[in-house]
Structures are given as structure tokens and as C-alpha cells.
Amino acid sequence: SGVKRALTHTNSFTGERVPRYGVETPHEEELGRLLGDLDRWGVDIFRIGDLSCGRPLTAVAYSAFTSRELLSTLQIPARTFLAFAVTLEEHYVRDNPFHNSLHAADVTQSTNVLLNTPALDAVFTPLEVCAALFAACVHDVDHPGLTNQFLVNSSSELALMYNDESVLENHHLAVAFKLLQNDGCDIFVNLHKKQRQTLRKMVIDMVLSTDMSKHMSLLADLKTMVETKKVAGSGVLLLDNYTDRIQVLENLVHCADLSNPTKPLPLYKRWVALLMEEFFQQGDREREQGMDISPMCDRHNATIEKSQVGFIDYIVHPLWETWADLVHPDAQDILDTLEENRDYYQSMIPPSPPPA
């Protein structure tokens, strides 16, 4: 799949009425109750997926933008916003077990909560908040359900296009900005040129930072920021230059992208099952094509519980611990849940067979 594929959308909003939560659903009341919890960590996003009739990203994006009054502040027409959201959601691959529009809705909702953290109160401008939410919405659009490494190893069209560098992340960005050019989909039509340029730069910086190969350097920079942390009189973080501001936003979206293990255990377990199925499907392709099977992708040799503990210990916990330091004490509950979930998976590791 490349950008060349026609980026079309069906306009479901030719009527005058804009649906209350951005999606046509017979479950409006119950959906509304759940979306009322959009600023709570651990909302049941799977239920939102069901109640929104398979359009969780549209519902979450519309609710987040409207509740923050971003449509009025940035002069985004509601119908344009919905036309874009529906089109964006259609360009997520429904057949991917994990990297589909439900994951995008989840990351957007998590980003929305993190932006509300007291340590960041009134730190970011409406344009910056919009950029972060937009980046979360688009960050995996048209994901093929395969890793960067697979795309590079198989000399895919996309790897050729992007010279093996952040292949997927470059593609997600290109598709997202291309979709804005569709008729009636340019949500930034009323921004000044300078604002558009700033927003575009921020979104690119944030989405490229979701490439896991950038994780260690992103975390190193975050640790440095924690060590030199400056706080304004009101107790909120003092971020007085673009480099510091975008660095916090990049890490915020990265945290949201790696937030599954910090959610209530029943949600986390569902996400793990979906991600493993996507990995296994890649492993099946690798086996068929005579390629080496990627780590964690062999369904006949998987150590799911052990993999999760390792993922938490080496990647997720160091990131969230550092984020929690930055916004102390705002993220303590999130960190506690992460540690409980780690202990659960540790306890579920099957005992090794005795040596022969």
C-alpha cells in the first residue's frame, strides 16, 4: 500500500444535521455517557468501538476537539472536521487485529487525558493541543499490520519510497496530510499560513517520534529535562522554547502510544491478545516466504507473558517512570497500575520444563 492509492471518502454528512457525537448510532445515550469520561484514564475504549458502530476514532476525535472548544477557537467547521475524521478512519485498515482505528482512538483518548495533567495546566496553546490530538489521531493511518523491519527486509514499496528510514511513520504522515486535500476535508483551512506551518512541523515531529527505534534517544532527552526541570510560580512546568515544548509533546504522544500496559488489566489483556495476533500473522508470512521469523512473531514458539514483562521492564516502565517524575505527582496512579500489571504477567509465566 502506498500513497498512490486513491484517497477517497464517502460523505455521510450530506444532510444538515451533525450527529451529536459525530457518528450515527442507535446507542447515542450510552455512547454519550462513555464519552463523558474522555478525560478519565482507563475508559472502556472497546465499548466505545461497539457503541459507535465501528467508528471509535471519529467519536473520540470529535468529542475531544469539541469539549476543548478547538473547533471554535481554531475556526474549524464541524462538518469539515467530521468529513476529515470519517475519511481518516476509513484509511485505517479494519482487518489489522491491533493497528486499526480503535488503537488510534485509544491513543487519542490517552493523549487527551495526558494533556489535562495539572503540571501542564495552561502550558500549551490551543494550536499545540490541536497538533498533539491530531498527531495521535493520524499516527498509524494506513498501517499494513507489519513492522518497519519486515518492510525493510522484504524490500517493500514503502521501504523503497522512504529509504528504510522510519518507513511506516513517514507513510502515516504523508497519508494524513494528503487526506486534508480531499474536498471538504481541510480542517485547517482557516488557520494563517504561519499557524499551518507550525502545526505541520509539530505533527511531523510527534508522529516520527512514535518510531520505536527513536525510543532510547527520546527517553534520554526526557531524563535530561527532568534533571533540569524548571517550574513556574504556579507549580506548572516552565517550557519557554520550542525545543522543550515539542520534546514534552513528543514524549506525551509516545507515552499514550505505549499506554496499554498502564490500563486496567482487562483492557491491557485484550490489547496484548490483539497485538500478538498481528505479530503472529507477520510471522506466518515470514515463515511462508522463508524469511527469519521476527522476535515474538512465531505463534508456535511464543512466550507472551515473558515478552510483556520484558517489554515493561526495558521500555514501558523506564518511560512512564520518567514521565511521572516530570509531572510529579500527577501520574502516580498510572505508574502503580503498570507495576501491578507487570506483577500479574510475571506471575503468569509458565514454569520452565525441568532439564532433560
Task: Please give the residue ranges for each predicted region.
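N-terminal charged/capping segments associated with class I S-adenosyl-L-methionine
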Residues: 51, 56, 74, 97-102
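Hydrophobic alpha-helical transmembrane segments corresponding to the first two to three helices
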Residues: 85, 99-110
